[in-house]
């Protein structure tokens, strides 16, 4: 499994626009083969930071996501509210289970 997690700086005054774009992207992405989770949220300590968390079956599914039509649409919208470079990492996970 591939996990993607990170953050990007945004103009927090555009929270409604950001939320609408993120929700549209989430709905479309969850329909992709191999997408297990796809979430955006505002950081609780900084209204100018959006956090992203994704779970993918494998690298192939994630690679296909990058060329999906809704990804291009989302990237065009992101330019209207992102204020800097994102910090996003990819992790290969070999095991997943409940926290003990």
Please report, for each region that a protein language model flagged, where it lies by residue:
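Glycine-rich beta-strand-turn "strand-cap" elements at beta-sheet edges
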Residues: 2, 40-48, 76-100
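N-terminal first-folded block
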Residues: 2-40
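Short, well-ordered beta-strand segments in beta-rich or mixed alpha/beta enzyme
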Residues: 2-9, 39-66
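Short alpha-helical
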Residues: 13, 45-47, 69, 73
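Intrinsic disorder/low-complexity signal
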Residues: 16, 53-54, 91-94
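Short acidic, gly/pro-rich beta-turn/loop elements at beta-sheet edges
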Residues: 16-18, 48-50, 62, 98-100
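An amphipathic, aromatic/His-enriched active-site/gating alpha helix that lines ligand/cofactor pockets
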Residues: 24-36, 55-89
């Amino acid at each position: 499994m591939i996990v993607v997690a990170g953050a990007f700086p945004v103009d927090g005054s555009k929270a409604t626009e950001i939320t609408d774009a993120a929700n549209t992207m989430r709905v479309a992405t969850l329909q992709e083969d191999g997408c297990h989770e796809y979430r955006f949220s505002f950081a609780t300590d900084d209204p100018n930071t959006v956090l992203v968390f994704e779970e993918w079956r494998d690298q192939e599914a994630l690679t296909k996501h990058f060329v999906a039509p809704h990804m291009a649409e989302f990237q065009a919208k992101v330019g209207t509210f992102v204020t800097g470079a994102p910090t996003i990492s990819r992790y290969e996970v070999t095991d997943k289970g409940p926290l003990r």
